[in-house]
């Protein structure tokens, strides 16, 4: 793919894509919901950040400073909701391609509508979508931070072992095992989690969709193997590893989080995402990088303007 097709600049004016609106006569997919309990999880029994002098520490630019797990977190049970969208066109017994969305509730308003329209227009296959909420909180010391910002295969293992079997049991769908038919997406730390799912298990996921990805130093608790968390991806992990069969679409706002912070903070979102794109390009990945002029962090204007096209781009050529 030519560089001109891979690196795009959009904005600063945005309008919702027509596929984000309800269209007359379009079949509407069914949505089922169920609850997961931390007490049943082998992967995530539940934590929450302790609010104390240690967790209130910040660097000169306002970024949290990570600490050891026992200093910043305490056990706390949680419940999480999972929603499953099944398109009307799904044929029972067939192995369905699917998409896992992190911070699932945040996509429940727009994504099913987009899928209804794109599937009806045959621009994407009849996707099942799995919307998974986090275990709660945000950033260092929290359950969400542990799940999404950790640079390991743990979260992917959790989805594979504890979420997808329940999806099958609750809905009766059959899910494909073909990584080309399995996508994962998210925004902010949820986007970092999506990439991490594919990076550590490309045999499971071959497609990633990222908005304002947290490819920065936010891993908590710290891991000596990746001391700067997801910043390590574009610093050296992508360059040093054999190319993996992953296709990624990613967008970041020009005025995203900490856009004017210096590099040495390892916490500048636009810089981190630009570096991700450069690392992917250098390694020959199939990627698309979108810089959204005038946009902020996980800017809803950008999501509504680009989501249909992003999904179509990710799923092009799938049979």
For the regions a protein language model found, what residue spans apply to each?
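Non-catalytic cap/lid and distal C-terminal segments of serine-dependent acyl enzymes
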Residues: 1-319
């Amino acid at each position: 793919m030519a560089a001109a097709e891979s690196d795009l600049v959009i904005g600063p004016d945005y309008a919702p894509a027509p596929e984000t609106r309800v269209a007359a006569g379009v079949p509407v997919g069914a949505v089922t919901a169920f609850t997961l309990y931390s007490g049943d999880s082998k992967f995530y029994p539940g934590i929450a950040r302790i609010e104390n002098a240690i967790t209130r520490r910040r660097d000169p630019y306002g970024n949290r400073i990570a600490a050891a797990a026992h200093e910043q977190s305490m056990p706390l049970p949680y419940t999480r909701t999972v929603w499953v969208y099944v398109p009307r066109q799904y044929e029972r017994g067939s192995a369905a391609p699917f998409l896992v969305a992190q911070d699932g509730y945040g996509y429940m308003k727009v994504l099913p509508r987009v899928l209804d329209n794109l599937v009806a227009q045959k621009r994407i296959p009849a996707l099942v979508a799995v919307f998974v909420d986090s275990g709660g909180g945000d950033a260092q010391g929290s359950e969400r931070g542990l799940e999404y910002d950790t640079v390991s295969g743990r979260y992917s293992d959790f989805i594979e072992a504890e979420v997808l079997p329940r999806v099958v049991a609750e809905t009766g769908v059959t899910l494909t095992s073909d990584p080309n038919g399995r996508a994962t997406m998210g925004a902010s730390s949820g986007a970092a989690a999506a990439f991490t799912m594919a990076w550590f298990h490309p045999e499971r996921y071959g497609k990633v969709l990222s908005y304002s990805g947290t490819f920065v130093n936010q891993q908590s608790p710290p891991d000596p193997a990746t001391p700067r968390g997801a910043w390590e991806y574009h610093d050296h992990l992508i360059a040093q590893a054999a190319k993996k069969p992953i296709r990624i679409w990613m967008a970041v706002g020009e005025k995203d989080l900490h856009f004017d912070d210096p590099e040495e903070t390892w916490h500048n979102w636009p810089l981190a995402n630009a570096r991700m794109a450069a690392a992917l390009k250098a390694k020959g990945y199939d990627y698309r990088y979108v810089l959204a002029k005038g946009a902020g962090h996980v800017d809803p204007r950008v999501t509504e303007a680009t989501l249909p096209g992003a999904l179509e781009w990710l799923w092009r050529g799938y049979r």
